[in-house]
Amino acid sequence: MDKTTLSVNACNLEYVREKAIVGVQAAKTSTLIFFVIILAISALLLWFQTSDNPVFNELTRYMRIKNTVNDWKSLTDSKTKLESDRGRLLAAGKDDIFEFKCVDFGAYFIAMRLDKKTYLPQAIRRGTGDAWMVKKAAKVDPSAQQFCQYLIKHKSNNVITCGNEMLNELGYSGYFMSPHWCSDFSNME
């Protein structure tokens, strides 16, 4: 044991360096363990990358999909702005276009309107998904029309708007899909 005697105000103090040595040894050991762990993780990652592991192939595919979806965001922003301007032109002098109506798309009815704030097509939503599409049994189907009217009366508080809102909530905007009621509405009027 390495001791040093210090005299302070006529008091002799013995300072033991042994505890300081143990602390230094612990720091050296923990540093060595840390670098060994980092080296092991690096070697494992190198092995994964050079062994053509399917996990990294999936991650690469996921990154490509994520970048593609980010590219869609700018396209959807542009299309949403164009459709909003188009909606403003359609709404000029037509206050009834802001009220829900059953629009006939041939094979189905959708209860829809233009949104008063964004001037984008808006439809009554089915749960947390897309719009209610009331399929018709025949070319003229009064029961489908009646159910569409029921939706307007009782379900009009749950709506989905084409464009950015739909892209954020459902993963698609509705404009670049065919057939879809958002793109079909743009072609109808």
UniProtKB/Swiss-Prot annotation:
Main location: virion
Subcellular location(s) per record: Virion membrane; Host endoplasmic reticulum membrane
Transmembrane regions listed in the UniProt entry: 29-49
GO biological process terms held by the UniProt record: fusion of virus membrane with host plasma membrane; symbiont entry into host cell
Free-text description of this protein's post-translational modifications in UniProt: Contains two intramolecular disulfide bonds. They are created by the viral disulfide bond formation pathway, a poxvirus-specific pathway that operates on the cytoplasmic side of the MV membranes.
Keyword Iron: no
Topological domain ranges for the Intravirion compartment: 1-28
Domain of life of the source: Viruses
CC terms in the record's Gene Ontology section: host cell endoplasmic reticulum membrane; membrane; viral envelope; virion membrane
Membrane topology of this protein: Single-pass type III membrane protein
Annotated Pfam families: Pox_LP_H2 (PF03356)
Keywords (A to Z) from UniProt: Disulfide bond, Fusion of virus membrane with host cell membrane, Fusion of virus membrane with host membrane, Host endoplasmic reticulum, Host membrane, Late protein, Membrane, Signal-anchor, Transmembrane, Transmembrane helix, Viral envelope protein, Viral penetration into host cytoplasm, Virion, Virus entry into host cell
Entries under InterPro entries matching the protein: Pox_LP_H2 (IPR005023)
Intervals, Virion surface compartment: 50-189
Keyword match Disulfide bond: yes
UniProt function note: Envelope protein part of the entry-fusion complex responsible for the virus membrane fusion with host cell membrane during virus entry. Also plays a role in cell-cell fusion (syncytium formation).
Subunit structure of this chain's protein: Part of a stable entry-fusion complex (EFC) which is at least composed of proteins OPG143, OPG147, OPG155, OPG86, OPG94, OPG107, OPG104, and OPG099. Formation of the viral membrane is necessary for the assembly of the complex.
Similarity comment: family membership: Belongs to the orthopoxvirus OPG107 family.
Protein name per its UniProtKB record: Protein OPG107
